[in-house]
Amino acid sequence: GVVDDGGNFLPSGERGELLIRGTSVIHKYWERPDSIDDFLEDGWFRTGDIAYIDKEGFLYVVDRLKQIIIRGGENIGCSEVESALAGYPSIIEACVYGVPDERLGEEVAATIYADNQVDVAALQESLKSKLANFKIPKYVRISETPLARIASGKIDKKSIQKEHVLELDTKKT
């Protein structure tokens, strides 16, 4: 099922967190007492995925709950912004994440790897036709090398985000 922040099941078409249960679903993680909140008393498991179910009953997973940026009360899915960036000419890889913002809580930031020089202002302008203004990255960092990866081959979002936050903090001082 798909639930809202209060744990209430949502009607078809509405996005929320995906819960699953069944005989093949685990009931706890081995040696991970910190994960107790992922398992509900009635057998439901919180997947951490943002999803919706359409009117025909098909399930669509659209993002990860941990990869949501909350900017001034607006929820922004990193994958949506990454997809928009990937459509820009010369961008090979994109990684989107939140960075701390005193006023809004978080601000949208991105690190990109491209095969040619990218004009950040032109990139931000072009994103206006694909994304709402509040979803457009305020901070864009250009990497001269392919983006860092973890052992599974996925982009190492945590380390890229940490580096960018450190750079931004350095610029503030």
Where are these regions (language model features)?
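Phosphopantetheine-dependent thiolation modules in NRPS/PKS and related acyl-activating systems
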Residues: 154-173
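A short acidic/small-residue loop/turn micro-motif
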Residues: 17, 67, 162-165
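AMP-binding/adenylate-forming catalytic domain of the ANL superfamily
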Residues: 132-154
